Swiss-Prot record:
This is N-acetylglucosaminyltransferase. Its EC number is 2.4.1.-. Transmembrane segments: none annotated. NCBIfam families: nodulat_NodC. It comes from Neorhizobium galegae (Rhizobium galegae). One of its GO terms (cellular component) is plasma membrane. Gene3D superfamilies: Spore Coat Polysaccharide Biosynthesis Protein SpsA, Chain A. GO terms for biological process: extracellular matrix assembly; hyaluronan biosynthetic process. The lineage of its organism: Bacteria, Pseudomonadati, Pseudomonadota, Alphaproteobacteria, Hyphomicrobiales. InterPro entries: Chitooligosach_Synthase_NodC, Glyco_trans_2-like, Nucleotide-diphossugar_trans. It comes from the Bacteria. One of its GO terms (molecular function) is hyaluronan synthase activity. Involved in the synthesis of Nod factor, a sulfated N-acyl-beta-1,4-tetrasaccharide of N-acetylglucosamine which initiates a series of events in the host plant species leading eventually to nodulation. Its main location: membrane.
Amino acid sequence: MTLLETIGIAAVTLHALLSAIYKSMQAFYARKASGSQPRSKDIDPAALPSVDIIVPCFNEDPAILSACLSSLAGQDYGGKLRIYMVDDGSCNREAILPVHDFYTSDPRFEFLLLSKNVGKRKAQIAAIERSCGDLILNVDSDTSIASDVVTLLVEKMRDSDVGAAMGQLKASNRDKNLLTRLIDMEYWLACNDERAAQARFGAVMCCCGPCAMYRRSALLLLLDQYQTQLYRGKPSDFGEDRHLTILMLSAGFRTEYVPEAIAKTVVPDRMGSYLRQQLRWARSTFRDTLLALPLLPSHNRFLTLDAIHQNIGPLLLAVSSATGITQFILTATVPGWTIIIIASMTMVRCSVAAYRSRQIRFLAFSLHTLINLFMLIPLKGFALLTLSNSDWLSRGSTTDGPAIAESNAASNEAEIVASASPFGGGTSWRFRR
């Protein structure tokens, strides 16, 4: 046995052992907890917290934006609800203004039109400073939420120790092609395996941007840190959802996952868009993992194992894959042990997912292993080597995935040039920050 074979076998075996331990514990903790909270419908509406929904938007497709706003208007929530749609200097503003106009007669809606593109994070903050609700729900402009999402998330936020809660994400364009079907299954696993297990300890590590609720009092404490995130002295403009979640945990708040709160978001339908999205996410994950490390000792040991698996696992898989390919090129011999282990792990994972979800389609998720091995793992390596790069790598297409249409164009000042809120009698107003 050559040194190359030994390294490959050792790496893939260690990866298999790590994954077996981690996935077993994850499946155990991801089980649905018993017990239920009182439904908000059974509570006096006057006692319910007020909720502000914030929707940042940049160059969104009018039909997709209309579906988003329609789902917000249809929320079955007994408490006070306000909806702030922030247009972040869209180039297609003329095309989306008719969508705004359709809701101007609804007193719950207010439209903030930024004169220039400032990026998703600053667009959110513009609305946060304008709003006053007890709870803030962030919804991406390419996302539609079920009618009970606000109610379900508010129920989880009734615990004052909870600083943030997210719903379950699904792909609204799942049936478009094979890639969107795989991404939809990837989302299911990310939510109902990873987030569900983390939520058992009140420490969801990323409350995903398309549908996440925050406690205003907690958010205001963290707003300066959120707004001025730096990495190696440079502004960090993406991964805002993960960063804000880590800030919540650092401040001592719990972060939760509510699987019944369903949000459907547009996912990439082209491989190039998907890889650009994954590159941004990989960079933000690596950056905020460093920020999260000091938190791990104060939480259950499973979360430390989770961090190890998320970061060391891909490294072991990369080593085993690279040595296997090199072995085949140099010696024309097939790395049989590596192939058997990876194939076995894939089938076990997909079979467990099919059983837990009661959906046989998850057996087809084995195809995603090829994408992971030959595209995502090298991409993560590139992300690690280019952590200082904060480019969004987006052309503004709405098919680039959740929230990726927003640009990271830098600007320290934003001007709100108009409001479609009927409270102002249709009069334009301005303010600067």
